[in-house]
C-alpha cells in the first residue's frame, strides 16, 4: 500500500443528506445560549455584540419564548440568557460607523456573573 492514497479526500455526499432546516439551526443556536462559556466566547473573542445584525437576530429569536415554540426547548435556561442579552442590547445604539455603542459592559458582565448564573440555572433544574 502506498503512502499516498489514490482516493479523493472525504467529501460529504449530497445524495440523501439534507442540510438542517432553519428551524433546527435556530433551535440549536438558541439552546447554545444556555452554555455560558460559549456565550462568553462569542462576546469576547468575536466582539459579535457590537454588530447590529446580531442585536436584530437575538431580538428575532425571542419567538422561541412563546408557545408553541417553547415545547421544543430542552434547555429552558437558554431563554433566560436570550432575554438577558436582549435587555443589554436594547440599550445599545448604532453609531455612524455601524457599530453598536452602549453595551460595552456586556462581555464583562457575562464573564463576571456567568458562573453564578450557571449555578442558579442548575438549582432551578434541581428545584
Swiss-Prot record:
The keyword Nucleus applies. Pfam families: Med31. Keywords: Activator, Nucleus, Transcription, Transcription regulation. Gene3D superfamilies: Mediator of RNA polymerase II, submodule Med31 (Soh1) (1.10.10.1340). It is found in: Nucleus. Its main location: nucleus. One of its GO terms (biological process) is positive regulation of transcription initiation by RNA polymerase II. Disulfide bonds: none annotated. Component of the Mediator complex. Belongs to the Mediator complex subunit 31 family. This is Mediator of RNA polymerase II transcription subunit 31. It comes from Eremothecium gossypii (strain ATCC 10895 / CBS 109.51 / FGSC 9923 / NRRL Y-1056) (Yeast). The lineage of its organism: Eukaryota, Fungi, Dikarya, Ascomycota, Saccharomycotina.
